[in-house]
Design a protein with these regions (language model features):
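Surface-exposed, gly/pro-biased binding rims or lids
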Residues: 114
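Conserved beta-strand-loop-alpha-helix junction that forms the acyl-donor binding cleft
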Residues: 98-108
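Glycine-rich acyl-CoA binding loop
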Residues: 74-77
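GNAT-family acyltransferases
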Residues: 1-61, 66-69, 82-86, 90, ...
Length: 147
């Protein structure tokens, strides 16, 4: 693959947090960064990553970024659906979580498309105020399937 847009190079995004996590616990690497690749050009146009392994309640949070010229073309939907379906192969995953700035209307529309439920807000020390959305794994399977 080529990376002409320099995804995760000029702005490290999740790598700043994920690399130290993997150094501390290499087994957690499977939950981290996946490239989003434009098939026709074999170019990286974004990335997605879980924030870590499922927590003690089985909740699994995800984040993603798509380069601006490729937004609103379905790539985020495809990437999230693929990641969540992959995560369902691990029985410890009970709930999917998605947090987003209340100002990020496109991302809120995306998570509403999937049918996630708004759970409230939290204050993130880096990102500031975030809306919290969740969907139980069994509800996800009922709506979207597992493969």
């Amino acid at each position: 693959f080529s990376n002409p847009l320099r995804v995760l190079i000029d702005f490290q995004g999740p790598l700043a947090w994920r690399v130290p996590q993997v150094k501390a616990d290499p087994a957690c690497n499977k939950w981290f960064v996946r490239w989003i690749v434009l098939k026709e050009k074999q170019e990286i146009i974004g990335s997605t990553s879980f924030h870590g392994a499922p927590d003690s309640d089985g909740a699994l949070e995800i984040g993603l970024g798509i380069e601006s010229e490729y937004q609103n073309q379905g790539f985020a939907k495809e990437a999230l659906l693929g990641m969540w379906r992959w995560a369902l192969t691990f029985p410890e995953v009970q709930t999917f979580r998605y947090t987003v700035s209340p100002d990020n209307l496109a991302s809120i529309a995306l998570i509403n498309y999937f049918g996630f439920e708004y759970k409230g807000q939290q204050m993130d020390e880096i990102d500031g105020a975030e809306n919290i959305y969740e969907m139980r794994a069994v509800d996800f399977i009922a709506k979207w399937g597992s493969n």
